[in-house]
Design a protein with these regions (language model features):
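Single conserved hydrophobic/aromatic residue that forms the stacking wall/gate
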Residues: 1-15
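Bacterial N-terminal signal peptides that target proteins for export
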Residues: 17-27
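Bacterial Sec-dependent N-terminal signal peptides
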Residues: 33-63, 317-323
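Short, low-hydrophobicity acidic/polar segments
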Residues: 85-178
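A sequence/structural signal for flexible, mid-protein segments enriched
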Residues: 145-236
């Protein structure tokens, strides 16, 4: 039944006020329920979403004195609870910079990224991450390894990036150190060097890989390194980088020199240089060595079976131009 209401009567006014109060109460209940549900949903999203930390990475270059700063540095953050979810950042010129990554506990490795020819293995694992070198065939068909490029780096076993106050940055300080040795050599007592068309050299009892987080050599690895050289007046000279001599006990270091004359004949000279290698003090695996080899040999002029050069892919060579003070 519809009753017309006299808007000027007290009865109608009372009914209207009562209906208005009921509507307001229902509206308030709805609003509070909506706020509560929204707050719960936001709270869940907040817990599910990782908080990011601002990190300022600082490079301390005081321990690099014999080499220019690299083209850039790569920093890898390994979460301790999930190494597969690494965070990788590049810093051109090795300059300091700020990055953001989820709050967590990390282990960190850094190294220069201008390392053409390096083979990186197990880079998804902090403890197994390895710098390796490629295999190559020597002029007498032996399996050897190429020499690595210059490498520097650092590692930190534990970095806690949690509960960092808003608006502030956590500092991660990295101090790169030299991670390769510098070997140079001179060969004396050779005659007929004007007949040399090509040459290579090798050194056995060396390590062709390096564990990055331990800055250490594999305990069970011994390889021969193959490298370049040049004729300089009455000598053959050269230089190369290496991770160091093998950690295996009793492994000899034999220097082999491959010479091809202009008629295609190959000569192979060798000499044990173990004493020269091991007499140099090392810090860890690092120790620069200068090898002096003395032969009494004349490069023949007779023709051989092959051409005047070695059949080696030039991409397998990482030549090092060095100033050698004799």
């Amino acid at each position: 039944e519809i009753v017309d209401c006299d808007w000027s009567s007290d009865v109608c006014s009372s009914d209207l006020r009562r209906q208005a109060v009921i509507r307001i109460r229902f509206s308030l209940v709805f609003i509070f329920l909506w706020i509560g549900l929204t707050a719960c949903e936001h709270k869940d999203l907040c817990y599910d979403h990782p908080h990011f930390a601002t990190v300022r990475v600082i490079f301390d270059w005081t321990k690099i004195s014999n080499h220019d700063k690299p083209e850039g540095m790569r920093v890898v953050f390994y979460p301790t609870d999930d190494e597969s979810n690494t965070w990788i950042f590049d810093f051109p010129g090795g300059e300091d910079g700020e990055v953001e990554l989820p709050e967590n506990v990390y282990r960190v490795i850094c190294f220069n990224y201008d390392t053409v020819g390096m083979v990186w293995k197990e880079n998804g694992s902090y403890t197994l991450f390895t710098a390796d070198t490629r295999d190559v065939r020597s002029p007498d068909n032996r399996t050897m390894a190429v020499t690595p490029p210059w490498l520097c780096g650092d590692h930190i076993d534990r970095v806690i990036l949690k509960d960092i106050p808003g608006g502030s940055a956590e500092i991660v300080r990295l101090t790169p150190v030299n991670m390769v040795c510098h070997y140079t050599y001179e060969v004396n007592g050779l005659r007929g060097l004007d007949r040399v068309a090509d040459l290579r050299a090798a050194l056995s009892g060396m390590s062709g890989s390096l564990n990055m987080s331990g800055d250490s050599l594999p305990a069970d690895l011994s390889e021969s390194l193959l490298f370049d050289g040049m004729v300089s007046r009455n000598q053959i000279i050269g230089g190369f980088y290496t991770f160091g001599h093998s950690a295996l006990e009793g492994e000899p270091n034999v220097f082999r020199l491959y010479i091809k004359n202009r008629s295609g004949s190959m000569s192979v000279l060798e000499q044990d240089v173990s004493d020269q290698v091991h007499d140099v003090p090392v810090a860890g695996h690092i120790g620069d060595v200068h090898l002096v080899l003395n032969f009494d040999y004349e490069v023949p002029s007779e023709p051989g079976n092959g051409g005047p050069g070695f059949d080696v892919d030039v991409d397998d060579w990482d030549d090092v131009n060095v100033d050698i003070v004799l």
